[in-house]
Amino acid sequence: MTEPSLPRVGTGVDVHPFEQGRECWVACLLWPGETGLAGHSDGDVASHAACDALLTASGIGDLGAVFGTGRPEWSGASGAALLGETARLLAEGGWLIGNVAVQVVGNRPRMAARRVEAQEAMSAALGAPVNLSATTTDGLGLTGRGEGLAAIATALVTRV
């Protein structure tokens, strides 16, 4: 049976705790003066959630399977590098990326002033449109207490 060429949607989530002494990379941008995020790579929750959503939508796998701690070659990798490799994997698998929407959840860094710059950086790294928004949890949970940062992403892909 031939699979219909309908669009597919994937969701991705990523959460990292803050870690003193690390640079803060979120949405492919360096945030000077902000505490960095712990992680196997750069801790860029926005890029990681976007990759996870794309990998899920395409059925290739998930962030942990493709870039996880069992893959030492990705240790310390940038969110931009992960987005680029994810785009390559999808293209190799016959997928076209429609777009990705990412919402960053946390108190810091404040995304509003650099939102357009972040969208442009993520879109350039991925080679497809990325839209970004941000919110807080009004003091609730680990992001509300300022212990870390989270991101949720939705991706749309279609077969080429």
Curated annotation (Swiss-Prot):
Residues bound to a divalent metal cation: D14, H16, H48
Pfam families linked to this entry: YgbB
Cofactor(s) this protein requires: a divalent metal cation
Residues noted as binding 4-CDP-2-C-methyl-D-erythritol 2-phosphate in the record, renumbered to the chain: D14, V15, H16, H40, S41, D62, L63, G64, T135, T136, T137, D138, R145
InterPro entries, A to Z: MECDP_synthase, MECDP_synthase_sf
Pathway field: Isoprenoid biosynthesis; isopentenyl diphosphate biosynthesis via DXP pathway; isopentenyl diphosphate from 1-deoxy-D-xylulose 5-phosphate: step 4/6
GO molecular function: 2-C-methyl-D-erythritol 2,4-cyclodiphosphate synthase activity; metal ion binding
UniProt organism field: Parafrankia sp. (strain EAN1pec)
Keyword tags: Isoprene biosynthesis, Lyase, Metal-binding
Catalytic activity: 4-CDP-2-C-methyl-D-erythritol 2-phosphate = 2-C-methyl-D-erythritol 2,4-cyclic diphosphate + CMP
Cofactor binding description: Binds 1 divalent metal cation per subunit.
SUPFAM superfamilies: IpsF-like
Family to which the UniProt record says this protein belongs: Belongs to the IspF family.
Job of this protein: Involved in the biosynthesis of isopentenyl diphosphate (IPP) and dimethylallyl diphosphate (DMAPP), two major building blocks of isoprenoid compounds. Catalyzes the conversion of 4-diphosphocytidyl-2-C-methyl-D-erythritol 2-phosphate (CDP-ME2P) to 2-C-methyl-D-erythritol 2,4-cyclodiphosphate (ME-CPP) with a corresponding release of cytidine 5-monophosphate (CMP).
HAMAP family membership: IspF
Enzyme class: lyase
E.C. number: 4.6.1.12
Annotated positions for site Transition state stabilizer: H40, T136
Segments traversing the membrane: none
Taxonomic path: Bacteria, Bacillati, Actinomycetota, Actinomycetes, Frankiales
Protein name: 2-C-methyl-D-erythritol 2,4-cyclodiphosphate synthase
